[in-house]
Swiss-Prot record:
The protein's name in its UniProt record: DnaJ homolog subfamily B member 1
Function noted in UniProt: Interacts with HSP70 and can stimulate its ATPase activity. Stimulates the association between HSC70 and HIP. Negatively regulates heat shock-induced HSF1 transcriptional activity during the attenuation and recovery phase period of the heat shock response. Stimulates ATP hydrolysis and the folding of unfolded proteins mediated by HSPA1A/B (in vitro).
Gene: Dnajb1
Gene3D superfamilies attached to this UniProt entry: DnaJ domain, Urease metallochaperone UreE, N-terminal domain
Assembly, per entry: Interacts with DNAJC3. Interacts with HSF1 (via transactivation domain); this interaction results in the inhibition of heat shock- and HSF1-induced transcriptional activity during the attenuation and recovery phase period of the heat shock response. Interacts with BAG3.
Length: 340
């Protein structure tokens, strides 16, 4: 079952914008790592940020209300992405920094610094009560004076948010031939006034080269969320192999599990081995085949990443299926002919 963003924020469906803001403020303050040191607080803080990112955006919220998390992230019944080598994937992914969102919500300030910075945090204070009387939303603290001296006018050096990583799942056929993936992202961008923020969609194009190995990283610099006090994070896609219904991958080799009977293992057989490009290669075996034994078909695997004109091997891995029982007459014959 997918995430329920309303449940994450403790809201009922149909909550108003103000209720969503209040819920985010309450939950974010409760689980902020500067305040909450319990295990899992950091992950909960990220989930709260993602929930607010969706429910505070009318378009994302409408899709989520209709189709749930699966529909929002690309699997809605209204139309899935193409599965072909040049297929286009459209999906929402949260790639913002929850700490940057928190700071933006409170007008670029850290409320924990204001209230707790000179008092070592005072873990016992009730965060909800502390902030309940203050305005919410982006910039809610901007014009409030809490008795501290004004900071110097020297500009604060911006820091880049940490990289945001997403999996890029590809099939073995796509690795064999190479393909183009188009990923639609939604990120926040700073308007020309240098203060207000807009949501912006962008298509990131990834040229998957033949033979790329699992774990290959593709980086799009500074495509994360942008605010007035950060440098956007890099968006990093990490190549992951989709599970295949026939083959397994081992580097540039492709493993084909062949199931044969005990009679075939002892007496020899011909195995029709499929390939990634749709051909079938008949391979004859005359010797005894032991369970788990491997035989290679050279040059029928995946392209080598650095020299794609060369290819790895197709490896046949045998699984011998033993009979549940043997008739007495057959057992007698086997005892006579099989070596001890």
């Amino acid at each position: 079952m997918g995430k329920d963003y309303y449940q994450t924020l403790g809201l009922a469906r149909g909550a108003s914008d103000d209720e969503i803001k209040r819920a985010y403020r309450r939950q974010a303050l409760r689980y902020h790592p500067d305040k909450n040191k319990e295990p899992g607080a950091e992950e909960k803080f990220k989930e709260i940020a993602e929930a607010y990112d969706v429910l505070s955006d009318p378009r994302k919220r409408e899709i989520f209300d209709r189709y749930g998390e699966e529909g929002l992230k690309g699997g809605s019944p209204s139309g899935g992405s193409s599965g072909g080598a040049n297929g286009t994937s459209f999906s929402y992914t949260f790639h913002g920094d929850p700490h940057a969102m928190f700071a933006e919500f409170f007008g670029g300030r850290n409320p924990f610094d204001t209230f707790f910075g000179q008092r070592n945090g005072e873990e016992g204070m009730d965060i909800d009560d502390t902030f309940s009387s203050f305005p919410m939303g982006m910039g809610g603290f901007t014009n409030m004076n809490f008795g501290r001296s004004r900071p110097s006018q020297e500009p604060t050096r911006k820091k880049q948010d940490p990289p945001v990583t997403h999996d890029l799942r590809v099939s073995l056929e796509e690795i064999y031939s190479g393909c183009t993936k188009k990923m639609k992202i939604s990120h926040k961008r700073l308007n020309p006034d240098g203060k207000s923020i807009r949501n912006e969609d962008k298509i990131l194009t990834i040229e998957v080269k033949r033979g790329w190995k699992e774990g290959t990283k593709i980086t799009f610099p500074k495509e994360g969320d942008q605010t007035s006090n950060n440098i956007p994070a890099d968006i990093v896609f990490v190549l992951k192999d989709k599970p295949h219904n026939i083959f397994k991958r081992d580097g540039s080799d492709v493993i084909y599990p062949a199931r044969i009977s005990l009679r075939e293992a002892l007496c020899g057989c011909t195995v029709n081995v499929p390939t990634l490009d749709g051909r079938t290669i008949p391979v004859v075996f005359k010797d005894v085949i032991r369970p788990g034994m491997r035989r290679k078909v050279p040059g029928e695997g995946l392209p080598l990443p650095k020299t794609p004109e060369k290819r790895g091997d197709l490896v046949i891995e045998f699984e011998v299926i033993f009979p549940e029982r043997i008739p007495v007459s057959s057992r007698t014959i086997l005892e006579q002919v099989l070596p001890i």
